[in-house]
C-alpha cells in the first residue's frame, strides 16, 4: 500500500508541540484509508514523502499544488521502494488535488515500474472544495 497524504507531507506550524503531542497533526484521510487497507490485506505500508514539505496552510498548499500541476513538476521523493519486485499487487492512495493526482504520486509512478502488477487506486476528495 503506497500512499501520498498531505498530513505526512506538511510542514508543522511553529506552535505545534510534537513532544507532548496535544497538537500533533492527526492522520489524514488517505493515511487512515491506507491503514485500513493494510489491516485488511496484511500488506506493507509505504508513505510517499517529498523532500520539500508542503505548507500546513491549506490555501498555500493548494497554490503550490496548482503551480506544480501547471509546470508538470515531479517533486523529489525522500525514498524509494527497494523491493517492489516482491509485490504482484499494489494499492495506491492519494488525495484528489486539482481534479487529479498530486504530482508526487506521478513522481512515484515514473520511478517505479508497475508493469504486470495488479494496481488498485483509492482517493479522497473531501478537502477539494474548501477554499
Q: Where do the protein language model's features map onto the residues?
A:
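Active-site-proximal alpha-helix that buttresses catalytic centers in soluble enzyme cores
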Residues: 1-131
Amino acid at each position: 500500500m503506497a500512499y501520498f497524504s498531505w498530513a505526512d507531507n506538511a510542514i508543522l506550524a511553529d506552535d505545534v508541540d510534537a513532544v507532548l503531542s496535544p497538537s500533533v497533526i492527526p492522520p489524514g484521510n488517505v493515511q487512515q484509508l491506507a491503514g485500513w487497507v493494510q489491516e485488511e490485506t496484511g500488506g506493507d505500508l509505504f508513505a510517499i514523502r517529498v523532500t520539500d514539505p508542503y505548507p500546513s496552510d491549506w490555501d498555500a498548499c493548494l497554490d503550490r499544488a496548482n503551480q506544480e500541476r501547471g509546470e508538470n513538476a515531479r517533486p523529489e521523493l525522500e525514498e524509494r521502494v527497494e523491493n517492489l519486485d516482491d509485490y504482484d499487487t499494489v494499492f495506491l492512495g492519494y488525495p484528489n488535488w486539482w481534479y487529479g493526482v498530486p504530482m508526487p504520486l506521478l513522481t512515484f509512478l515514473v520511478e517505479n515500474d508497475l508493469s504486470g502488477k495488479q494496481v488498485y487506486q483509492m482517493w479522497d476528495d473531501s478537502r477539494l472544495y474548501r477554499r
